[in-house]
């Protein structure tokens, strides 16, 4: 069911995004996480994004504190030293609550085309992070379900393509809300205890598979080289 929910997040994002880099290039990652920011389910996308989101989620919790994360919040983060990505890869996180207790997050990391960086599009010759555009350090775009219009306007006035940027932002928000609702429905149906047991089973199963694969590797020291365009 969690995989199905993640795939639904994926479909909603693709169907509602404004940018070709989302609905054609698939430059995004979506996932569902537990309350320790451990990945439980992901949909097809850039795996590095989904892996980076757990780090971003931990930074959000550390920055805001558990006491300042509330039901129906949605938090944006793109500060590279907290989000494990460059500035244009923006994380949105929706905390998931049951009986007023944080049980997890749904999250989307997605490339935005323009946040006022020094050059339109990609700028590969920047010399510091401040040339990459607007920095968003764990700010709430939704506060207890209420849209933060001040932050919307800040983003609007810092983008050369505001309609496109805000359209992609809304697609991301919708995707996060989808994941949040599906997990809430799951817990309502089966109960918190059953959900917690299922989460631990998922993580234990993943660890067992990884250990089996590692055990098949021959003993030795391994290294590799590869090349990228200059």
Annotate the PLM regions.
Residues 26-77, 187-230:
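Gly/Pro-rich turn-and-neighbor structural signature
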Residues 83-89, 115-116:
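Short, Lys/Arg- and Gly-enriched loop/turn segments at beta-strand edges
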Residues 102-158:
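Gly/Pro-rich active-site capping loops and adjacent beta-alpha segments
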Residues 24-27, 88-90:
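Short, small/polar residue-rich loop motifs at catalytic or cofactor-binding pockets
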Residues 135-209:
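N-terminal leader/propeptide and maturation segments of large enzyme subunits in energy/redox metabolism
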Residues 1-25, 61, 65, 77-83:
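Short, basic/aromatic recognition patches
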Residues 1-16, 36-49, 172, 184:
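Extended, highly charged
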Residues 89-99, 107:
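A short, hydrophobic, proline-anchored segment that marks a local hinge/packing element in signaling
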């Amino acid at each position: 069911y969690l995989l199905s929910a993640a795939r639904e997040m994926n479909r909603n994002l693709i169907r509602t995004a404004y940018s070709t880099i989302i609905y054609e290039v698939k430059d995004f990652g979506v996932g569902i996480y537990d309350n320790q920011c451990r990945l439980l389910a992901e949909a097809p996308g850039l795996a590095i994004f989904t892996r980076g989101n757990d780090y971003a989620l931990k930074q959000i919790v550390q920055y805001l504190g558990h006491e300042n994360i509330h039901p129906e919040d949605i938090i944006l983060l793109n500060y590279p030293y907290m989000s494990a990505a460059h500035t244009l890869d923006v994380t949105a996180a929706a905390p998931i609550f049951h009986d007023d207790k944080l049980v997890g997050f749904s999250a989307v990391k997605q490339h935005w085309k323009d946040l006022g960086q020094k050059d339109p599009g990609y700028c590969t010759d920047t010399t510091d992070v401040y040339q990459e555009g607007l920095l968003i350090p764990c700010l709430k775009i939704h506060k207890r379900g209420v849209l933060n219009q001040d932050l919307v306007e800040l983003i609007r006035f810092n983008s050369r393509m505001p309609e496109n940027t805000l359209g992609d932002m809304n697609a991301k928000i919708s995707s996060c809300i989808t994941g949040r609702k599906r997990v809430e429905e799951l817990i309502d149906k089966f109960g918190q205890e059953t959900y917690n047991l299922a989460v631990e089973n998922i993580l234990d199963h993943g660890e067992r598979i990884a250990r089996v694969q590692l055990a098949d590797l021959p003993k030795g020291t391994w290294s590799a080289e590869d090349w990228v365009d200059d």
